[in-house]
Structure formats: C-alpha cells, structure tokens
Amino acid sequence: MIIAVDVDGGDYAPKEIIKGALKAAQEYKIGLILLGKKEVIHVHAGHYLKKLPIEIVHCPQTVTFNEHAVEAIKGKPQSAIVIGTSLVKQGKADAFISAGNTGAVLAAAFFILGKIDGVERPALGAIITTRPHIPSLLIDAGANAECRPNHLDEFAHLGNIYAKQVLGLENPRIGLLNNGEEEAKGTKLTLETHQLLKKSKLNFIGNIEGHDISLNKADVIVTDGFTGNIVLKTLEGLGDALLKVRKVGHAIDSAAHLRGRALLADVGLGSMVKGMDFEECGGACLLGVKGTIIVAHGRSHARAIKNAIGLAKRTAEKGVDKLIAEDIKSRTKAGTEGDPKNVNTPV
C-alpha cells in the first residue's frame, strides 16, 4: 500500500504534514510518496528517509488557498495536487491526501481521474462521531453547493456503499436532512428527493432534523454540499467550544480530584469532545471518482494527517471506487434501481 501525500497544503505545512505522514508510515506499515519541495522534505524528514519506505517527488509549484481551482490545476501542472492525483491515475499510488485548496483537489480528481461511469456528481463523505464510538457519514460535506433531487439520491447510494465498507455497517440507515420529519415538509429539493429515496431499495428511514444528527438517528446523512459543509463546520465549532469548557473545568477543579458524578460527567464530555474532533477522522473521502482521494482539513496538525492516511488506507483496501462502479452497473442492468444488498460488497 502506497499513499501519496501533499506536504505543501495546509495551514501547518510542511512540518506538521510530514510529521503526521511519518507517524502513519510507522503505525500502518505503508509506503509513502511525499510531494513537495525536495530540500524542505529532507530537512523535516531527516533520518526517517532511510528507515522508512518513503519516496520524495519534487514539486516546484504550490497551489495556494486563494487560487481559483481550475486555473490553479491548469496553470500549475508541477504542483503536489496535480502530481499526486496523477500518481493515483497511473497506479503508482493507491491513494492521495491533501490538506490544501479543496477546490483544486476536487478539480484535479475530476479532470485527471474522471468520474466513475454513471456518477453525475461526486460528493465528499465526512465521517462524524457525535456519540462515543458510533460514527455516521455526512454526504455531501461540501463538493456540490447546488444540487438536484437525483444528485442527492446518488449521494445516498454512494454513502450506502461507503458506510458498509469503511464503517462496517451491514444495512446503513439512510436519512434525508430536512427542516422536519414529516414527508410533506421541506423545500422542492428535499420533497422530490424524499420520493426518490422512498422508492429506492436503500434502508431509507425518512427525513431527519438537525438535532437527530447528535442522536445518531441515521448512519448516512444525505444533504446538499452547501448545507452539509455548514453542518460539518458547526459540529467542529461545537467540539472546539466543548474542549474549551472542559479545560476551564479542569482549571477550576485543579485543587481537588473529580469524584462521583463529576468524574462521570467529565469522562462523558471527554468522549463527546473526542468524537467531534475533526482530527480523529482526519479527512473526507471524495466518492464517485476513479480512485481514492482524501481531503484533509486545512488546519490539520500531525494527528489529523496520520488519521487521514489511515482512512485513505482503509478506503483503498476496500476498493470502494470499484464497488461503487459495480453497484451502478448492477442497478443499470436491472433496468431499475435494484437492491444494493445484492451487490457483492462484503463488510
């Protein structure tokens, strides 16, 4: 297993990216291709370059966060984002991760890897854990701001396969994020999407509201990318706020040990904070393209990068992109939606 890593992208690049990548190489026993300025990588990786299976690919160009995605990809062919995606296309890397310009990463994936046949809109699937050890998938988490009902229906099918393979769920519960549980409530988009999902062979449980996310009512939360990204950022902000509250509580109780209910409350809060910490998962997977692409958070530190690489490894090992292609072929061949349970996707 070889993972290509963009060491130029992110608020804390290259030091934290390289640090996280080295930890991943040691923990997951994988090979790495580090993409960036060769001399900089040598400075931060040091003697690990001789101890670990690491290859360096010099990338003289860098895509910044404020650049237009398509223009950056076309104008900077020697950037880590373009070269890393190309390595996946060529079969020289099993996956590529970047904490850089998200739009540029998506554009590179679309233009270089291409969409899986039958997929109209690839989407970002982000794993969220609002309850200890009970993950769910939010899709779309930011790739498509404007969507049609058939796009959300497509997201549900993409998320269903990912939840089976990566989250290990046998029959994922699919929920449509809406402003009410009632079938007759919502916008034109959610009303029409509801009918499509209702007719599907997915385990569609109906509409879910915002508060249902933290209660883990659904395993796959389906929404458009604009709403999904706001939800994701809100959860991240809440996690940061809870962490600050917990730190203040520890400072107040520094003179005495927590006991009884106070201790239980602290443990519970700690579990919740950990679950809502974006660094726990590491990144979001771009589903619907021919290859494994993980988009890490721009403010990722070493732990987030290590975990993003772990996610890339699990996703690539499961061959999620190939299973998505099989699922589409199966449903197309049937001439109807077909039952995703019949696709050979062992958990």
UniProtKB/Swiss-Prot annotation:
InterPro entries linked: FA_synthesis, Phospholipid_synth_PlsX-like
Enzyme Commission number: 2.3.1.274
Complexes and interactors: Homodimer. Probably interacts with PlsY.
Organism this protein belongs to: Dehalococcoides mccartyi (strain ATCC BAA-2100 / JCM 16839 / KCTC 5957 / BAV1)
Entry GO MF terms: phosphate:acyl-[acyl carrier protein] acyltransferase activity
Protein name, as recorded: Phosphate acyltransferase
UniProtKB keywords: Cytoplasm, Lipid biosynthesis, Lipid metabolism, Phospholipid biosynthesis, Phospholipid metabolism, Transferase
Catalytic activity: a fatty acyl-[ACP] + phosphate = an acyl phosphate + holo-[ACP]
Name of the gene: plsX
